[in-house]
Amino acid sequence: MKKKLNLCPKGTYDFFGQSAKIFIDVRKVFFDQAKKFNFSYIETPIFEYANIFLTTNQIADIVSKELYKFFDKSGRELALRPEGTAPIMRSVAQHKLFQTEKKFFYFGPMFRYENPQKGRFRQFYQAGFEIINYKKDSLEFQILEIIVLIKSIFKDLGINEYELKINFLSNLTTRNIYEKNLAQYFEKFSDKLEPISKIRIKKNPLRILDDKIEQEKEFVKLAPKINTFWTMEDKNIFNRITSILEEFKISYKVDYNLVRGLDYYDDFVFEFIDTSQTLGTKLALVGGGCYNNLPTKFGLNNFKSIGMAFGIERLIEIIKSKKNIKEQNLDFFLLSFTDKEILLNFKLAKILRKENFLVDLNKTPFSVSKGFQLAKKSGAKFVFFFEKNQAKNYISLKNLQTGKNEQILYTEINFEYLNSIIKASENA
């Protein structure tokens, strides 16, 4: 079957117009916040050796059915990155970036072969923050920094409808005991489970707990809870975490079924869930937790780490739903009716852009009527143009909202005045 050339692949999209503008604004918020919290930017390849994403537990969803794997011309098995944490740990190990506690930030596209739907794509953007090689006794403070950072980002984005869910998965030993009990419990209900969950019973029963279909079933809601298997140390750690959240007046809800989709998480895990109904269902806007076992895969032992990642497309959808988004229009359009005027306006554009004004100009001469039609379509607030028999060194400036026309000295432009009329037009 012949594929249409004018369609992007299923599960992908093009950013343009309002979405592109919001994307740029959102990206700026993340870079600004990363700088404020002293996170260093790190960029890893879009594709890696596939084995950095593969685990002995092959039931992890992004491994079993969502990983984009391929062989290159030399027979090496590669994969498009489905998430950002494993590549960063690979980079940390490769470049020996582990002498002291490090704080990394990334922003870029990820790839998963999943069913496209609202808030889910096959190519999607994530912004992530990782704190690696921290001291064990500082866990609650690392968590506090991560949560405070998230709330600061939400504030800058104008997002205020969310709920923080938390859980504590304990260490590998305790979790193995819990998973064994969980598997025995779900065996009794195997005939009521979805096909993928029947496989999960033996491979990763934890994933049954947060499956969107399974979690609505009563017997899943009544499944054994992780907290009944906590050691005294686990209870003390969890109490310290919740106490510090309460001290900083951070609202949270304990969800013992919260496990996260990637199987390298342990200890503390969390998600911020959208409660605005913009996305249709209560999807996670950001999620993460501790991953103390993942570093061992890269030869890094006793390596405490915590991180989280935001789904950028979901943030954009929420921001788009708000009615108070202002389009960023041009400040000035420089209209030319002759080749000579085009050259003069290029010089003027350079001067105005240096002063951070938003400027565009026509590069083909137009008649007066067509020229002003073009200027209005550009969305500019004002248009500069030369009139016939105009006084030497002067140019006309027209307010496209009011129609007011005035003469400006071309050789001595008053930037303070231009700023004032731009602000006045924005408040009109």
UniProtKB/Swiss-Prot annotation:
Protein biosynthesis in keyword set: yes
Top-level taxon: Bacteria
Localisation: Cytoplasm
Keywords: Aminoacyl-tRNA synthetase, ATP-binding, Cytoplasm, Ligase, Nucleotide-binding, Protein biosynthesis
Cystine pairings recorded for this chain: none
A GO BP annotation: histidyl-tRNA aminoacylation
Cellular component per GO, a single term: cytoplasm
Primary localization: cytoplasm
Pfam family, one: tRNA-synt_His
InterPro entries on file: aa-tRNA-synth_II, aa-tRNA-synth_II/BPL/LPL, Anticodon-bd_dom_sf, His-tRNA-ligase, HisRS-like_core, HisRS/HisZ
Keyword Nucleotide-binding appears in the UniProt entry: yes
EC identifiers of the protein: 6.1.1.21
NCBIfam families xref list: hisS (TIGR00442)
Subunit (UniProt): Homodimer.
Family: Belongs to the class-II aminoacyl-tRNA synthetase family.
Protein name: Histidine--tRNA ligase
The species this protein was found in: Mesomycoplasma hyopneumoniae (strain 7448)
